[in-house]
Each structure stands twice: as C-alpha cells, then as structure tokens.
C-alpha cells in the first residue's frame, strides 16, 4: 500500500447528553443536513481510500437517516476517543495515514484538511486553535523550541498548563504503521477514566516522530457542538457564509441576516429574495425571479420572471416562466405549472399539471388533475379527488370557465371551452363548448317572518 493512501475515521458514537434530545447528537442539523452527513461529504471530497464512521448511541437512527457509501463501525462501549479509533482499526490500511474527524464538528472544510495533510506528510498532523476562551479544552504543550510535546486535557492539567490558550481541536493525521501499537498502549488512568486519542501525541514524540501543528484559520471551522446554543451559533455562521456567497454572486437579499439556505441553490441573474425566506433541498431559480417575504420553498424549479408573493409554500414542484404565485399559495409535490400561470391567495395545487395562461386566483383546490391552457377557476372551486379509499383524476381542457363555488367530483372530464355555472357540483363528463349547471333551484318563500329572540313558541 502506498504511503500516501488516506483513510478517514469519523467519530460519531457519543450520546450528546447536553443536547437534551432523544436524537443522537450527530443527527442534529446544520444548514438542513445532519452534522455527521456534512462531515462525511467533506471527507469524501478528499478522495480517501475509505471512510469509517464509528457509531454507538442511537446507531439505528443514524443508519436509518444517513445514506452514504461509508464503512459503519459500532463502538459498543463509549470508552473514549482512543477506544473509538481502535474499533475502526480492522478497516484501515496497514500503511498510509489516517485522518480523524468528528461527527459533531460540522463546519470543517476541505481546504483546512488539505493544509493539515500537506503539513503532516507521513508523520503526525495536529489541527490547533487559539480561541477567546479555552475553558474545558485540551491544551497544546510545547517545549522550549516550540515543538509540540503533548496534549493535556483540562481536567488533568495543572495551573501552568491551564494558562495555555492554544487548544487541541481533536482533528489529527496519524501514520497507520504506528497506529495499532500506539492505540494498544493507551491507558485510561486519567480523570475521565477513558482512553484519550490525544495521548498519541506524546507517544509520537517518544518514538521520534515529528508532530506538525496547523492552526485553523477561523475557530468556527473546528468548533464542536455540545448543546443547542452551540448548534444555533454554528447554524448562524453557516447561514451568514451562504448569504455572503449569494450576495457576491449577484443575488439581492433584502436582509442577509433573515435568510436561510438549507440545501443547494442554482440561480440566474437579478434574483431578489425578501426577508425570512427559507430555501430547502435542491432549488433552481431563473432570471428576474422575485421571492416575497416569509416564503418556504423546497426542491423547486422556478422559471424566469416569476413572482412568488409573501407567505407562499412550494414543495417538489415546477413553476414556469412569468408566473404569479401567492400570496398565501401552496404548491405541493408534483405540481407542474406552465408559463404565464396565476395562482392566487389560498390556492392549493397537488399532483397536477396546469397549462399556459391558466388562472386560479383565490380559494381553490386542484388535486390529481390535468388542466389545459387559458382556463379560469372561479373562487371557491374544489376538485373532490378522493372517495375515501382511492384518489381519482380530473381532466380539464383549454379555455374552460369554472364558476365560483363549484365542486368537480373526480373522476371527471371537462372538454375545451366548457363553462360551469356557479355553485355547481359536476359529477359527469362535459363535452366541448357546453354549459353545465348542477345546483338546486332557488326558492323564495313569500310572507315568511324571521323569528326574533324572545319570541314565545
């Protein structure tokens, strides 16, 4: 095996007691993605020989949630970071090197890791930081020449060592040829009663192997998550970085501090996004699109020159060019809108294709339907697509005029240029160019007197 072969071990077995959650800590999300999944993606970008993820607490939840091509290794007892890496040993190459990452350090990036790997070479690499407050973190101990000699955990540190501000981030590069021997010689004789991975630094020094420290360029890149406050802080840093990149690329964000991107955004020119917009999953937005305040959009494609008015929700849908959506509109999965479509307030569309120029401006439900072009839905139109057991399809042709407060009971077909009278319940097919009326005849009672409160029976 070539000396440069790279294995990566991601430690993700911890319970995360301070998260106060039944969910394993590493499944809590940053930018819409579980933390451990984000770390796996970063690791994969380094093109390693393999990636081993050590899991323990909540392993079934982790396996059910994270679908990545990695080697899963179970740590049945949580006996420390050194013990965790030891469980992965059977899956590591005899030669080369191993990079140790953490499933609760979600913002580590490939650039930092590449710098660390280059500095380490075939020896030991250590990522360090100098935070404003090092309390609770392992200190980097150096000799008089400035060489790293050990890492001392705060619970085991004396007053002099606690005064050191440079800390261990936990991210290490280790030579595989030495790893098994070093891990096998670890002791749990410390304040925690655990096998510390950090003790390998002293073992490397004792074996004459140089330790190459690399200071991270920004503390948040190596920051771990132990509670919901830290999770929220890293989420805001992540979102700020996303917003900055979009602004540099020409997207207008009315308030970058009130914008969330929880996925991937592909955008055209002159896109404008108002406050409190949440974008999730894979989003594609064309030129000159405007998204109003308080919209939530997930896995959607929006064509050029379309306007999404405030408080609209779009999910797993396609919107053509020059559309007007909302306010308070909802496009559910498999809604497919052609160009020049208007969908107004309190209109819901699900599993339906809508033809060019069609309008449903208010208070309408369109489900499991195929709708032609230039059709108009009057206010209060409902497609009754469910019989209590099965969903049924409705087909509506071109230039249909559906009166207000109509119910179309599926399965039913309306031909081209059909008109339905307001208040009709349409249960049978209607041929082209026909008028359909299906409502009770109005009756006016002459001489009727409305009862008033207090009238005696």
Each model region followed by its residue ranges:
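Catalytic metal- and UDP-sugar-binding loop of GT-A-like glycosyltransferases, i.e.
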Residues: 30, 101, 436
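Glycine-rich hexapeptide-repeat left-handed beta-helix
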Residues: 307-457
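Extended, small-residue-rich solenoid/repeat segments and analogous flexible loops
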Residues: 206-313, 322-324
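Catalytic-core segments of class I nucleotidyltransferases/pyrophosphorylases
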Residues: 148-239, 244
């Amino acid at each position: 095996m070539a000396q440069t072969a790279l294995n990566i071990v991601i430690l993700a077995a911890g319970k995360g007691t301070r998260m106060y959650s039944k969910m394993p800590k590493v499944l809590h999300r940053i930018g819409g993605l579980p933390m451990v999944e984000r770390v796996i993606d970063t690791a994969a970008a380094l093109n390693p020989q393999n990636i081993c993820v050590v899991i323990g607490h909540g392993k079934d939840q982790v396996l059910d949630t994270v679908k990545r091509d990695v080697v899963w290794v179970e740590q049945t007892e949580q006996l420390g970071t050194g013990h965790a890496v030891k469980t992965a040993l059977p899956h590591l190459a005899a030669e080369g090197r191993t990079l140790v990452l953490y499933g609760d350090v979600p913002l580590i990036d490939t650039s930092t890791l590449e710098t660390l790997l280059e500095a380490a070479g075939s020896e030991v690499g250590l990522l360090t930081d100098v935070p404003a407050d090092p309390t609770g973190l392992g200190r980097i101990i150096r000799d008089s020449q400035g060489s790293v000699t050990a890492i001392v955990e705060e619970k085991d540190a004396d007053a002099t060592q606690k005064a050191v501000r440079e800390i261990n981030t936990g991210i290490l590069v280790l030579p595989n040829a030495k790893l098994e021997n070093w891990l096998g010689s670890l002791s749990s004789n410390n304040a925690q009663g655990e096998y510390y991975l950090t003790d390998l630094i002293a073992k490397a020094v004792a074996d004459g192997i140089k330790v190459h420290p690399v200071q991270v360029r920004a503390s948040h890149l190596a920051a771990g998550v132990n509670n919901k406050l830290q999770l929220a802080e890293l989420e805001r840093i992540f979102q700020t970085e996303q917003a900055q990149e979009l602004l540099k690329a020409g997207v207008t964000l009315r308030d970058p501090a009130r914008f969330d991107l929880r996925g991937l955004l592909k955008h055209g020119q002159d896109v404008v996004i108002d406050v409190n917009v949440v974008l999730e999953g894979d989003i594609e937005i064309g030129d000159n699109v405007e998204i109003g305040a308080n919209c939530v959009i997930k896995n959607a494609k929006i064509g050029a020159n379309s306007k999404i008015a405030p408080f609209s929700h779009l999910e797993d849908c396609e919107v053509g060019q020059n559309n007007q959506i909302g306010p308070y509109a909802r496009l559910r999965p498999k809604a497919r809108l052609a160009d020049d479509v208007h969908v107004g307030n309190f209109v819901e569309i699900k599993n339906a294709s809508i033809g060019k120029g069609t309008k449903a401006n208010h208070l309408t439900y369109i489900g499991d339907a195929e709708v032609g072009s230039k059709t108009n839905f009057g206010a209060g139109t409902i497609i009754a697509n469910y019989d209590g057991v099965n969903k049924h399809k409705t087909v509506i042709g071109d230039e249909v005029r559906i009166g207000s407060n109509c119910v179309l009971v599926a399965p039913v077909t309306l031909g081209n240029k059909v008109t339905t009278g307001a208040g009709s319940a349409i249960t049978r097919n209607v041929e082209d160019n026909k008028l359909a009326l299906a409502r009770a005849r109005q009756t006016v009672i002459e001489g009727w007197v409305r009862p008033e409160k207090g009238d005696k029976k």
